[in-house]
């Protein structure tokens, strides 16, 4: 399942703090890069989001926990919509409710 993991650094967290932790987790083999489908930082720094693929929410939690002293997370399961199919489905819903 695909998860959207929005993160915001806690006040006082520095770029160096985050860099050290990310590299530490990478070197330990704990970042699971094959599960990361996207990693985006917001302009201005200190926030962003990951798109990650996990079947087990407990595994996702274990992936995020080493960072939880540096940043907060808002995690949501997401699904992908195909535009054309979604429009057709919405047409059907709209027709039923009028």
Predicted feature locations:
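Generic hydrophobic/packing signal
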Residues: 54, 59-60, 73
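Conserved short beta-strand edge segments in small beta-sheet-based binding/regulatory domains
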Residues: 70-81
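Short connector loops at helix/strand junctions that flank enzyme active sites
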Residues: 44-47, 68-70
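Short S/T/G/P-rich N-terminal loop/turn motif that feeds into the first structured element of a domain
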Residues: 1-31, 35-46, 55, 80-81, ...
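Short amphipathic alpha-helices in soluble, non-transmembrane regions
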Residues: 21-23, 60-69
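Hydrophobic pocket/interface hotspot
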Residues: 5, 50, 60
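Conserved catalytic core of Hanks-type protein kinase domains
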Residues: 53-54, 66
């Amino acid at each position: 399942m695909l998860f959207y993991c929005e993160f915001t650094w806690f006040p006082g967290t520095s770029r160096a703090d985050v860099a050290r932790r990310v590299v530490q987790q990478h070197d330990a083999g704990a970042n699971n890069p094959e599960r990361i489908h996207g990693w985006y930082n917001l302009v201005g720094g200190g926030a962003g989001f990951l798109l990650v693929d996990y079947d087990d929410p407990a595994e996702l939690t274990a992936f995020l926990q080493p960072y939880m002293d540096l940043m907060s997370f808002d995690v949501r399961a997401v699904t992908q919509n195909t535009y054309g199919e979604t429009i057709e489905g919405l047409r059907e819903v709209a027709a039923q409710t009028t």
